[in-house]
């Protein structure tokens, strides 16, 4: 799934530009992705793109501190929680977006969840939501896509 998401991110500046799902599926098949990965990635993107931010908006009100539940602490490594905090502290994630990212991270198979996957997932959530991202923070997240810094 993550390879398909990475490919789509690199090929499209706007997820709304995908057009017809069946045509996109054929294009992805032609590039070499299998149907299961394509379906999983497109379903995931649809769910993120269609997700209403409304359930999360309460997090934007006030200046409270995010306390992780025990189950979240067990699931999300200190590195992943640190990444989320760093991105929020530096304006890349609003509290509502943070909650959406946490929900998406908790949906992953624990074996798939590492810091690079978390960076990629944050980038995909922000991309699907068409959110603005500070350039230097975007650069840090893009390292997860390219495996190396893209700016020198």
Curated annotation (Swiss-Prot):
InterPro entries membership: Smg (IPR007456)
One family name in Pfam for this protein: DUF494
Disulfide pattern: none
Protein family per UniProt: Belongs to the Smg family.
Name of protein: Protein Smg homolog
Taxonomic source organism: Chromobacterium violaceum (strain ATCC 12472 / DSM 30191 / JCM 1249 / CCUG 213 / NBRC 12614 / NCIMB 9131 / NCTC 9757 / MK)
Gene name of this polypeptide: smg
């Amino acid at each position: 799934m993550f390879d398909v998401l990475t490919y789509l991110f690199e090929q499209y500046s706007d997820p709304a530009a995908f057009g017809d799902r069946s045509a996109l599926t054929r294009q992805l098949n032609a590039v070499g992705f299998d149907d299961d990965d394509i379906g999983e990635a497109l379903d995931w993107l649809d769910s993120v793109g269609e997700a209403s931010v409304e359930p999360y908006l309460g997090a934007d009100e006030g200046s409270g501190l995010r306390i992780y539940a025990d189950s979240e602490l067990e699931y999300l490594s200190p590195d992943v929680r640190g990444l989320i905090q760093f991105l929020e502290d530096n304006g890349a994630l609003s509290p509502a977006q943070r909650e959406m990212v946490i929900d998406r991270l908790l949906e992953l198979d624990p074996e798939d969840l590492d810091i690079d996957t978390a960076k990629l997932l944050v980038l995909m959530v922000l991309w699907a939501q068409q959110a603005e991202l500070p350039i230097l923070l975007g650069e840090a997240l893009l390292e997860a896509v390219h495996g190396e810094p893209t700016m020198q």
